[in-house]
From Swiss-Prot:
Keywords: Cytoplasm, GTP-binding, Initiation factor, Nucleotide-binding, Protein biosynthesis. The keyword GTP-binding applies. It is found in: Cytoplasm. It comes from Streptococcus agalactiae serotype V (strain ATCC BAA-611 / 2603 V/R). Belongs to the TRAFAC class translation factor GTPase superfamily. Classic translation factor GTPase family. IF-2 subfamily. Residues 573-575 are annotated as: G5. The lineage of its organism: Bacteria, Bacillati, Bacillota, Bacilli, Lactobacillales. One of the essential components for the initiation of protein synthesis. Protects formylmethionyl-tRNA from spontaneous hydrolysis and promotes its binding to the 30S ribosomal subunits. Also involved in the hydrolysis of GTP during the formation of the 70S ribosomal complex. This is Translation initiation factor IF-2. Residues 537-540 are annotated as: G4.
Amino acid sequence: MSKKRLHEIAKEIGKTSKEVVEQAQSLGLPVKSHASSVEENDATRIVESFSSSKTKAPTNSVQTNQGVKTESKTVETKQGLSDDKPSTQPVAKPKPQSRNFKAEREARAKAEAEKRQHNGDHRKNNRHNDTRSDDRRHQGQKRSNGNRNDNRQGQQNNRNKNDGRYADHKQKPQTRPQQPAGNRIDFKARAAALKAEQNAEYSRHSEQRFREEQEAKRQAAKEQELAKAAALKAQEEAQKAKEKLASKPVAKVKEIVNKVAATPSQTADSRRKKQTRSDKSRQFSNENEDGQKQTRNKKNWNNQNQVRNQRNSNWNHNKKNKKGKTNGAPKPVTERKFHELPKEFEYTEGMTVAEIAKRIKREPAEIVKKLFMMGVMATQNQSLDGDTIELLMVDYGIEAHAKVEVDEADIERFFADEDYLNPDNLTERPPVVTIMGHVDHGKTTLLDTLRNSRVATGEAGGITQHIGAYQIEEAGKKITFLDTPGHAAFTSMRARGASVTDITILIVAADDGVMPQTVEAINHSKAAGVPIIVAINKIDKPGANPERVISELAEHGVISTAWGGESEFVEISAKFGKNIQELLETVLLVAEMEELKADADVRAIGTVIEARLDKGKGAVATLLVQQGTLNVQDPIVVGNTFGRVRAMTNDLGRRVKVAGPSTPVSITGLNEAPMAGDHFAVYADEKAARAAGEERAKRALLKQRQNTQRVSLENLFDTLKAGEVKSVNVIIKADVQGSVEALAASLLKIDVEGVKVNVVHSAVGAINESDVTLAEASNAVIIGFNVRPTPQARQQADADDVEIRQHSIIYKVIEEVEEAMKGKLDPEYQEKILGEAIIRETFKVSKVGTIGGFMVINGKVTRDSSVRVIRDGVVIFDGKLASLKHYKDDVKEVGNAQEGGLMIENYNDLKEDDTIEAYIMEEIKRK
């Protein structure tokens, strides 16, 4: 069967949804709102109930309006302006009036006042009668019904009087023009009938609702009493269980307490009687004859009783303040749990008394007392030094020792700490082999033969310029090779290669013999303590003499096993691949004797082989993993920078996700390009890696400043003497960091009397506009090694007349600079003051420095000028400008009477009223 919603039924029969809902509820249907659904038969019942109620409505209206006579009234209409033709028209029944609650209250109050005046003494004697409220309620209802009928009769009489008023004053009320009666709907009559039905329904159901509410309250009170009884019973059972576990004396005391607590049930009753204040009589004042004051006093008294009862109920329900209830057994006092003192205590400098108390499970007041007895005045928030903490622990009998602070920024601790590796997880790892030797003795050719790739043909001039790391496989085992350059300029790179290597292959040409770089390679290998395998190359040449090579090496401490030494000698031809297999077998044999082990389960640590800046990838570093396993997305600290491993490629250029021990990989994701030879370590999370990297960068910067600004007695004379020496300023830019260091070291070693090389700046990457600007300011020559300038840098260099030299072979660079130094003339300079300025205000900017706001009082201040800071007539600092601004724009000069801002290189102690003197050194042309 289909269902109907109540609002649909209301729409069909022309009733409101509220009426339909109330009618359905009166019929016993389980509905809640107008959206509830009922069956068709129930819907029929609802409709029929309304039809039956319509038939009863007139009788109800008659009953509610007893004594009201309906008369047909004649109303005078103003048709035209004459009084001769009055027209009469029957008026509809009077509109039933809604209940006037205000009038009812006033009438009820007046009736009560009259009754109290008439029977005041009788009411005082019978004020304890319990049934007086019910009688008063019934009387009030009767009076309200009578008043309501009286009000309606009065309103009807008023209407009749008004009609008479119209007749007396001969005024005709305006009426609408009559319309034909026809089948017109009388909306007023219908509204009156609906209102009468609502009043009848309300009066019929009000008593029922009141009874339901009272029943619900009684049920809730009953449930609350049951819950209290159950809780009390559970509490008594728990108390009995505790009493059984307690000792006998305590049990006897508790029995007495329980007996005493169980008897005074009358105490609670007496408290209630006292709270109801039954012993005090209620006095009603009769000063006001209409009884309004008595009514107000009674009302206030009832309100006070309600507040008092509510307060009492809250008091009884408040578990924290149940002082009057003794029907339950008192809770036993919990004793403080005793904690044993620790045997050892690890402290840090500056711990507070409260922290120490928490660690040793004692009250801070107890420790403060002990310190006072020791002669130390302290509060619980006061920090203590290490000696005081140790004395305090001695008083407690605890062995105290200071906590060892671990420097998270120290990467070297991973290499020095033997506990970092787990001896049970050590496994065999591939050997790291470094090929060393003199230039053009065939190192890259040997690697080319090993890897079957033409590496040597790609090097400019046939010389290896930077370290390469490669890995090959022989007899199922991997061997990692490091190719170090053989030129003398790359001494530091060879030293780095020897520090990470396990075996050194010293390659010597059979026709050239031992050369200076060969001896240097021997010394590096011996300093690193690694075994040496000598590969005598170019034995296919006609002038080859291997015996001479063996004897020359013996003079430098490298003795063949055939002569009773420890070094293996293998005669090879790298060009034709002769005896290469024998060389690899010798490497594996020596590696097996060395017992090379690694722990692959720890976080990776290792060394940077090479680093460079790539235009598309950013900082790229070649790493050699020495311990642990390096994974993609690992947070890593490399040298003085940090980052996350974004991508890894092996020596063949293939992407890999994991790199184990002795594996060379090239990674991206670093913030800056590190230095070749820096150590790296993987941290637990990126936050720790960032903190360690920033701390290392800060320490490196501080160390650099200390080195550049430190003047000692040993170098004081050299510093003063350096002013007489001419210098050639150069800026070095190269493709990799190793080439930058090697080129700078080679240029500084050039020995020309009276002239020295000053490397103003050296970095990795292409030559940019900043390098040109620096070269212009410092009068330097830019040397690019395997890099080219950007188009913007070339245009700026042409405009500023800055010289840029590009090279791909290191020999050419050294020769060119040496010739320039030999032909260097000694120019003369004189100082020229450009202008003076006064510091008006200073601004300190974090991570930038101190900015001085100034006004030029004489001359001008240019961007490339040197400045002196003069305070009270004394020169405080002499240096170069770091920046010069006019408002927010970078400018080359600030003129007289103009304001601007400046920063001075390596100086942040500017103060107001300091004098800035700008000057330049002009070259005096020789005549």
